[in-house]
């Protein structure tokens, strides 16, 4: 029994691009095995945050370190999901470094 005119939108965020690629592949494989149509994964723009920190505690304004955090994002749409698809996605165990947001529309 298919849920009519519905789709599941899954947004993934991670700092490590390898983890997010593995997780998206697991989600796509699981959805395709249950007979749902998958659109994606769509890579969204990478958010880069840069921080500059003074190394010395008192003087030496020129002594600084720069750090960067990159947040990778992916978007997956599952069109016409079945009940098996929803059950399989709920049972799926993903990596701990991946943030998953699921919305129905």
Curated annotation (Swiss-Prot):
GO biological process, one term: translation
Domain of life (superkingdom): Bacteria
GO molecular function terms attached to this record: structural constituent of ribosome; tRNA binding
InterPro entries in the record: Ribosomal_uS10 (IPR001848), Ribosomal_uS10_dom (IPR027486), Ribosomal_uS10_dom_sf (IPR036838)
Keywords recorded for this protein, A-Z: Ribonucleoprotein, Ribosomal protein
Record-linked HAMAP family: Ribosomal_uS10
General function of this protein: Involved in the binding of tRNA to the ribosomes.
Stated family: Belongs to the universal ribosomal protein uS10 family.
Name the record gives this protein: Small ribosomal subunit protein uS10
Organism annotation: Francisella tularensis subsp. holarctica (strain LVS)
Originating gene: rpsJ
């Amino acid at each position: 029994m298919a849920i009519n005119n519905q789709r599941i939108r899954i947004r993934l965020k991670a700092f490590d691009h390898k983890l997010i690629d593995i997780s998206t592949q697991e989600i796509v494989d699981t959805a395709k095995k249950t007979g749902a149509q998958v659109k994606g994964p769509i890579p969204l723009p990478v958010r880069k945050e840069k921080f500059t920190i003074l190394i010395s505690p008192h003087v030496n304004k020129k002594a600084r370190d720069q750090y960067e955090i990159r947040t990778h994002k992916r978007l997956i749409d599952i069109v016409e999901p079945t009940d098996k698809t929803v059950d399989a996605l709920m049972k799926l165990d993903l990596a701990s470094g991946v943030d998953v947001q699921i919305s129905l529309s």
